[in-house]
């Protein structure tokens, strides 16, 4: 499988990298070699899963990895996890794809320890970089454990997230593990606009903050109301059993 470093090695080191173009070049190599790689793609919510799945399922087998201990409160975390699974299930039914869903443990105290001392950082600052690293590291670890060809992140679809930073982090994480990072800039080529269209098509809940308690407070988000709304949404839902048909299975065992 092609490594992004093979492409970067042929570029001018002073040239700004267009990660969307790099991803397209990698996809062309897969097609030329008649391979369909397996990708463990970190997603933070259903909206960021939309166009990313529509695009990548043309070339690869995707498992979405919901690793988001940064999301607060817990009820909101459960809501986003549920809506993501609901979208994946409906996307598969509509398109004939077989995208799978895998969820990491929810350990918010671990996230809080990671960003200690960065609580007052502005959105897009050092706290965000640490958060990207924390979640991409978990994704890479799981990709190695389960034998995926690549790990990736759907975060680059957001116009509020710095794709350069996310890709820099992904490249650094790749150096630590025996797996490959798939770079991206999913917002390019009208990717973000398409994600908004798909949210309307699938009637997807679009949250008003990234999930981080610190960013939410800076934005003036009413977390009490968020918790109340999430609780009401989940009241008649069965998070454990409603979407077992899309859960990732490894050697025949559901994870």
From Swiss-Prot:
Cysteines engaged in disulfide bonds, as pairs: 210-212
UniProt: [4Fe-4S] cluster binding residues: 44-45, 128, 131
EC nos: 1.17.99.6
One Pfam family linked to the record: QueH
Catalyzed reactions: epoxyqueuosine(34) in tRNA + AH2 = queuosine(34) in tRNA + A + H2O
InterPro entries for the chain: QueH
GO BP terms, alphabetized: queuosine biosynthetic process; tRNA modification
Top-level taxon in the UniProt lineage: Bacteria
KW Electron transport (keyword) present: no
Protein's UniProt keywords contain Cell membrane: no
Keyword terms of this UniProt record: 4Fe-4S, Disulfide bond, Iron, Iron-sulfur, Metal-binding, Oxidoreductase, Queuosine biosynthesis, Redox-active center, tRNA processing
Enzyme class at the top of the EC tree: oxidoreductase
Pathway(s) this gene product operates in, as recorded in its UniProt entry: tRNA modification; tRNA-queuosine biosynthesis
Function, in words: Catalyzes the conversion of epoxyqueuosine (oQ) to queuosine (Q), which is a hypermodified base found in the wobble positions of tRNA(Asp), tRNA(Asn), tRNA(His) and tRNA(Tyr).
Family as reported in the entry's similarity comment: Belongs to the QueH family.
Protein name per its UniProtKB record: Epoxyqueuosine reductase QueH
Species name: Streptococcus pyogenes serotype M1
Organism phylogeny: Bacteria, Bacillati, Bacillota, Bacilli, Lactobacillales
